[in-house]
Amino acid sequence: MAEVESFQLDHTKVLAPYVRLIGSETGPKGDVITNFDVRFVQPNANAIGMAALHTIEHSMASLIRDRIDGMIDFSPFGCQTGFHMIMWGEHSSEEIAKVIKSSLEELSSDEFGWDNVPGVAEKECGNYRNHSLFGAKEWSKKILAEGISTDPYERKVI
């Protein structure tokens, strides 16, 4: 079987929340994509509930694109501790961490309401009933209070 990078990561050594550059790949035509581990909670110590995670996913899909060009995808980990963020081009962990922090600040604000969450209607989402804006806001506040590091092993909070 092929080795999967994320299964090679020692999940007992990382210190969440953090943004970690997983790697960059160059396609056959020279296009570069960059993959990031955006870890919001400590692996095997906590997990974001599915409804909150789902609302964070939908909200961040728009909030991140408002702040940086070239985002391909922001997809949750099955373990519910964070997200893969895939970008066109080369980007640093610090650049992405700043975008994530700013996006979470907006999501956690009092002004951010259901009207700001995209894709929460039946025709737009495959599990539209499974959302929690309250949960998304509470997790965002917790993540921001802990600080987002640019290093997975040493706290270098932006």
UniProtKB/Swiss-Prot annotation:
The gene is luxS. It catalyses: S-(5-deoxy-D-ribos-5-yl)-L-homocysteine = (S)-4,5-dihydroxypentane-2,3-dione + L-homocysteine. Homodimer. The keyword Lyase applies. Belongs to the LuxS family. Involved in the synthesis of autoinducer 2 (AI-2) which is secreted by bacteria and is used to communicate both the cell density and the metabolic potential of the environment. The regulation of gene expression in response to changes in cell density is called quorum sensing. Catalyzes the transformation of S-ribosylhomocysteine (RHC) to homocysteine (HC) and 4,5-dihydroxy-2,3-pentadione (DPD). GO terms for molecular function: iron ion binding; S-ribosylhomocysteine lyase activity. Coiled coil: none annotated. The keyword Metal-binding applies. Its EC number is 4.4.1.21. Its cofactor is Fe cation. This is S-ribosylhomocysteine lyase. It comes from Lactococcus lactis subsp. cremoris (strain MG1363). InterPro entries: LuxS_sf, Metalloenz_LuxS/M16, S-ribosylhomocysteinase. Keywords: Autoinducer synthesis, Iron, Lyase, Metal-binding, Quorum sensing. Pfam families: LuxS. Fe cation binds at H54, H58, C125. Binds 1 Fe cation per subunit. SUPFAM superfamilies: LuxS/MPP-like metallohydrolase. It comes from the Bacteria. GO terms for biological process: quorum sensing. PANTHER family: S-RIBOSYLHOMOCYSTEINE LYASE.
